[in-house]
From Swiss-Prot:
The gene is ttr-3. GO terms for cellular component: cell surface; extracellular region. Glycans are attached at N77. It is found in: Secreted. Keywords: Glycoprotein, Secreted, Signal. It holds the Pfam family TTR-52. InterPro entries: Transthyretin-like (IPR001534), Transthyretin-like_sf (IPR038479). This is Transthyretin-like protein 3. Residues 1-17 form the signal peptide. Belongs to the nematode transthyretin-like family. PANTHER family: TRANSTHYRETIN-LIKE FAMILY PROTEIN-RELATED (PTHR21700), TRANSTHYRETIN-LIKE PROTEIN 3 (PTHR21700:SF16). The lineage of its organism: Eukaryota, Metazoa, Ecdysozoa, Nematoda, Chromadorea. Its main location: secreted.
Length: 148
């Protein structure tokens, strides 16, 4: 039991240390969201960074770099940063109810952003273009979320 507590304390301390010794890294993404051929305005989009810990989602949750909503044309443009020791693994999380009927919670589409679109520095150097995304279809790996 003592070893477990010491291990947890060391892990928490090391994740806090990332903010002290990690370097600021940036990513940016844009795109257009559609639902059955119409702009999907108001859809929440988050620019996230994947933290691959030994206990995913427990002690080291994914970092939110930026968030926003699609405009009246269904377009979004996000740019954000986070501190990490190693290179970041950015992705987009799109939370929507397109063709969802009365099913509770929202559908979540995850779009991985190539690491080549991430950089160290004071702002994003390149913007990943997710293109036009039709949300009416079903996507492999799609999940649901009631808390976003």
């Amino acid at each position: 039991m003592r070893l477990l507590l010491v291990s947890i304390a060391l892990f928490i301390g090391s994740t806090s240390a990332i903010n002290l010794i990690g370097r600021t890294q940036w990513a940016a993404a844009k795109g257009k969201l559609m639902c059955e051929g119409r702009p999907a305005s108001g859809v929440k989009v988050k620019l996230m960074e994947s933290d691959n810990s030994f206990l995913p989602g427990f002690l080291d949750r994914d970092d939110k770099m930026a968030s926003g909503k699609a405009d009246s044309n269904g377009e979004f443009n996000l740019s954000g940063s986070t501190k990490e020791i190693t290179g970041i693994e950015p992705y987009l999380a799109v939370f929507h109810d397109c063709k969802d009927g009365i099913t509770p919670c929202q559908r979540v589409l995850r779009i991985n952003i190539p690491k080549s679109y991430a950089n160290w520095g004071s702002s994003a150097e390149k913007t990943f273009n997710a293109g036009n995304l039709e949300l009416a279809g079903k996507f492999p790996g799609e999940t649901r979320s009631c808390f976003n």
